[in-house]
């Protein structure tokens, strides 16, 4: 990753996320801001969201990083199991991150250890 003019780090590919093994579940994808307003909402909340997510007991890897396009952010997550992912979703559902970024489109897929890929919901 490289720092951009706004001093954030840009993501390339999987941001170093390990492949899931056993019962682990990974999420991979992008958040695409439509305009500077959405970008500012994301920038305001992303650091706290990443820190809170990384502090969750079932979180093994969590990265949201800006790509070369300042409006597009790479998302890579890895959780111990499906229950840990559900706990993460429950926490974020009522978070300031969710409130501030709910209108920003996400293209996220769920990756199981067996290589199955399904749309994340």
Regions found by a protein language model. Give the residues of each.
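Glycine-rich beta-strand-turn "strand-cap" elements at beta-sheet edges
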Residues: 2-25, 64-71, 97-121
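An amphipathic, aromatic/His-enriched active-site/gating alpha helix that lines ligand/cofactor pockets
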Residues: 52-60, 78-112
């Amino acid at each position: 990753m490289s720092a951009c003019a706004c001093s954030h780090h840009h993501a390339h590919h999987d941001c170093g996320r390990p492949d899931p093994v056993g019962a682990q579940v990974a999420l991979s994808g992008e958040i695409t801001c439509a305009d500077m307003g959405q970008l500012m909402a994301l920038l305001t909340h992303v650091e706290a969201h990443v820190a809170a997510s990384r502090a969750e007991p079932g979180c093994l890897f969590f990265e949201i990083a800006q790509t070369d396009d300042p409006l597009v952010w790479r998302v890579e997550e890895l959780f111990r199991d499906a229950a840990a992912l559900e706990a993460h979703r429950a926490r974020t559902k009522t978070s300031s991150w969710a409130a501030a970024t709910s209108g920003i489109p996400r293209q996220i897929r769920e990756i199981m250890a067996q290589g199955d890929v399904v749309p994340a919901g």
